[in-house]
C-alpha cells in the first residue's frame, strides 16, 4: 500500500486508522444485520469495505472482535439520547426529546436495530457484561430521575 511507503505524521496515520476502522464497522454492520453473526464471514466484511482480509485482520483479529465493536458502537449511539436526559429539565420536554431521538435512530439505522434485536433474541452473549454493568447503572440512574419527577409532582405516578 502506498501509505506504508511514505512518511506520515502520527496524526495523519491515526486519522487514516480511524477512517479504516469506521469503514470496517460500517461494512460489518451491513453484513451482520443481513446474515447474522454465524452466517457472516470476515471475507464478506472485507469485500464490502474494499479491503483484503489480511488488511482487515490488522485492525480486528477475529470476527468476534468486529461483532462486539459493532454492537458497542451501536449501543453508544443509542444510549446518547438517554445520557442527555437532564434531571433539571422539564420532564415532558426531556422525555419527548429522548423518544424522538430513539425513533429517528431506528428509522435512520434499521440495520443497527435489526442487529441489536437479533443479539438480544440470541441471549446477548456478546454484550452481556455491558448490559449487566454500565447499561444497568445508566438505566437505574435515569429511572431515579423519573422517580424524582414523579415525587415532585412533575409527572403522574404509574404502577
Locate the predicted segments by residue.
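Amphipathic, non-transmembrane alpha-helical scaffold segments
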Residues: 17, 25, 67, 71, ...
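Helix-turn-helix
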Residues: 23, 31-65, 69
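Hydrophobic alpha-helical connector segments
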Residues: 69, 83-112, 152, 156-159
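N-terminal intrinsically disordered/low-complexity leader segments
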Residues: 1-20
